[in-house]
Amino acid sequence: MGIYLGVSEIKKAFLSGTPLKQICLGAIPLLATGPELVCVEAVTPLSPERFGLAAAAAGSCALFGGGLSNSGVVAAVDAYDASLTRTVPTPLSVARHFLTAAAVGEYVLFGGGATSSAIVDAYDASLTRTTPTALGVGRRLLAAARIGNYALFGGGHSGSDSAAVDAYDGSLTRITPAALSEGRYALAAATVGNYALFGGGLAGSAAASTVDAYDESLTRTSPAALSVGRYSFTAVSVENYALFGGGNAYGPKSAAVDAYDASLTRSTLTPLSRARNNLASAAVGNFALFGGGETSAAVDAYDEALTRTVPAPLSAARFDLAAATVGDYALFGGGRGGPYSAAVDAYTIN
């Protein structure tokens, strides 16, 4: 598996003055002064091409499920192991898109989706599918995060903005914690310390800045709001921070990035290199990656000191993609940017 960073990227980097710790042509390192994010080639694509899918990882596999393809809504699931070998498990029980996914125990859970589905599908370490109790309210454009022994599914849209939260434990038993402080959809969620955070979203005709935090006992608190209200964005955890990046501020696209530490203190970071919405995020090593967006191939990386760098872009500009981490790789799969995409880009630390 070779490492690629094209001549055009090298030229652009030098012309812009971007510091490069390592540049690679093929697999030949030209410079090497420390850990660097690189994108690997020849990852087997998804089957089929699609957008509006969801992804999460548990155990030794990252799973990409659901979405909308050229032939319609799909139930397809693709699994990638730590060596980036792809297998195709049993599909979702119901085809759907704009669903979400989270891990708990040995399971990856896919929940919700259009059109206002309440279905939850769970895949164990052997990729066997079971169908636990459905969500309390069917909805799409919801968000999910793991905290302690629970996977939480919050918000969404089901004819109206939803504040519902469903929690599944490691035995796939569902309970219903306190609802979000306001109903909203197209929100984002991530975990930091002892908290799962649900931030932003679209509430009525306004871009929300609200953040709700759930601890391991599923008690809800309300930390400082996002610096900018926005929706159709993404969140990711790295080291001691949960980062919320990009989005739509009900008109202009946003490049804002907010970081919450384990005490729920918020700081505002160097913004993304390009304002964009409907992007995806994943972490690898000590880097949080924000990739793609409408319509961009850009990737922004934030390390544990919250310093931003700009690694090689995705292989193609696309949005409504999904991302997950497995082994030493952060994977960005699917999306649309003209044609629907089956591409999977993998980032690792060299």
What residues fall within each predicted segment?
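Kelch-like beta-propeller repeat domains
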Residues: 2-5, 11-13, 21, 25-350
